[in-house]
């Protein structure tokens, strides 16, 4: 966690070899809540921070996607992988969502499920729903 007031903050993830340096003009609180990836989108008037889903959730989702689409074991499926790039159509996506719901013990609202296009989006929604269950 980092707090800064009109200063710079430098963060380095232990698993990554990169360092991110950011300069802020207003008070900002940064916390990664146990996630390994933080990304910062800076514009002149605002800062938005998006966090990738936990790696273990992404890996589980990737395995389920590979299983549902009958992909080979050596087929690479990562967080940024789009279902359509794997050859999935709308019916395949419905089957993926059903598999995810069963595996994680959750129910996805249809309007949210229809917006899922990547492994990471699925993982983030799953984490959101699991957190809401607590």
UniProtKB/Swiss-Prot annotation:
Additional remarks: In rape seeds ACP is coded by two multigene families. There are probably a total of 35 genes. The sequence shown is that of ACL1.C1.
Function: Carrier of the growing fatty acid chain in fatty acid biosynthesis.
Major localization class: plastid
Family matches, as SUPFAM superfamilies: ACP-like
Family annotation (InterPro entries): ACP, ACP-like_sf, ACP_chloroplastic, PKS_PP-bd, PP-bd_ACP, Ppantetheine_attach_site
Residue ranges of every copy of the Carrier domain listed in the record: 55-130
UniProt family annotation: Belongs to the acyl carrier protein (ACP) family.
Keywords: Chloroplast, Fatty acid biosynthesis, Fatty acid metabolism, Lipid biosynthesis, Lipid metabolism, Phosphopantetheine, Phosphoprotein, Plastid, Transit peptide
Lineage, highest ranks first: Eukaryota, Viridiplantae, Streptophyta, Embryophyta, Tracheophyta
Gene Ontology terms: cellular component: chloroplast
Organism of derivation: Brassica napus
Subcellular location: Plastid, Chloroplast
Pfam families: PP-binding
Transit peptide residue numbers: 1-51
Tissue specificity comment: Seed.
Domain of life: Eukaryota
One MF term in the entry's GO annotations: acyl carrier activity
Pathway: Lipid metabolism; fatty acid biosynthesis
Record-given protein name: Acyl carrier protein, chloroplastic
Modified residues (O-(pantetheine 4'-phosphoryl)serine): 90
PTM comment: 4'-phosphopantetheine is transferred from CoA to a specific serine of apo-ACP by acpS. This modification is essential for activity because fatty acids are bound in thioester linkage to the sulfhydryl of the prosthetic group.
Keyword Nucleotide-binding: no
């Amino acid at each position: 966690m980092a707090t800064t007031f009109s200063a710079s903050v430098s963060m380095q993830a232990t698993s990554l070899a990169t360092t991110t340096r950011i300069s802020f003009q207003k008070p900002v609180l940064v916390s990664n809540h146990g996630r390994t990836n933080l990304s910062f989108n800076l514009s002149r008037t605002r800062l938005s921070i998006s966090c990738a889903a936990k790696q273990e959730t992404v890996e589980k989702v990737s395995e389920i996607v590979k299983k549902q689409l009958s992909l080979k074991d050596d087929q690479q499926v990562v967080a940024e992988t789009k279902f359509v790039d794997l050859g999935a159509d709308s019916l395949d996506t419905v089957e993926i969502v059903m598999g995810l719901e069963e595996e994680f013990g959750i129910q996805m609202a249809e309007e949210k499920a229809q917006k899922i296009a990547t492994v990471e989006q699925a993982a983030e929604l799953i984490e959101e729903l699991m957190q809401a269950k607590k």
